[in-house]
Amino acid sequence: MENTLEKKWVEDIEYLKEELKKRHNNLFAYTAEESFNEKIENLKSMVNDLDYEEMKVEISRVVASLKDAHTSLIFPAKRFIPLKFYYFNEGVYIINTCKGYEKLLFKKVLALGDMKIEEVLEELSNIISFENEYFFKAQSMKYMQIAEVLYGLLIIDNMDKIKITLDEGEYEVSTCSFEDLVYTNERLPMYAKNDSENLWFEVLESGELYIKYNSCREQGEESIGKKIENILCLIEKKNIEKVTVDLRNNLGGDSTLFTPLIDYLKNSEKINKKENLKVIIGRETFSSALLNAYTFKNSTNAKIIGEPSGGKPNCYGEILRLTLPNSKLVITYSTRFYKLIEDDLVMALYPEEVLLESIEDYINL
């Protein structure tokens, strides 16, 4: 084989196989090594027949077959559908739009290209790394927005314009760059506001303190530690007795950043009561945010409400990255096993009170 594109892809695939085996904490915890090796060899034999977008999808398929939600291809994407999707119990709906597509807001999605939405989701389930259905519901909506993913899966044949069938008609949508992905609907549920801020808080009219924790990562000049100090000062100053901590959209980072707040709430006699302290979890509560949720569950009297978590309690995590030498595609992989509970078959943290949002709830919030 000459130094061709084919040879470079084969080198990358072989590198992926060998390096994951070397570096991952326990690569074959959920799938057989023979099955993985077979998928690798199959992919090598296909390189001549696949274009770049299809190769990305097929590498993602191999990595997703390991069934470790922390081990995945970071999908390089340049073209996006200018619509934000959400997977409700009633189906997939558009919950936000970019300029020019406002009339599609809150419509139900029936098909992309010529493929029914149920089949699109089935295709996506084979290339996304997830451990439970709740995380898939979250991740699939992000992948569904990426034109390169849909093209690589042969769902569409044009990455610039995409046909989308809604419950009241068919539309052609032009894709856009990430920079142009600016949503226009400002009538959002409170939890969906300030979604780019790692930690924010607000005293509600009822006097309850609402704390939204979106990311266990530092951001900007004000540290999470400083923000927590401000929260504690506010609680003392206003003599707050009821607190809701919302972790529903937190995909993780460093679980220790939130410890000072959890410790304070744990030691507060007036707040640390089931009727006064609530923690909201959901399909995007994952990794370090799930560790925080379990700390609340195990060391406070908080009532856990919301949807089951996207993260599995016992899981592999603490990710590092490897870069394929030729294509420069990046794959995350797990370096540590977290055992939070005895029963490894429990797939999520299940709330005491399940709150499943319908499209009507979302519109009327």
Tell me the role of every PLM-derived stretch.
Residues 1-242:
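Flexible, low-complexity junctional segments that flank or bridge functional domains
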Residues 3-17, 197-365:
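C-terminal "post-core" interaction segments
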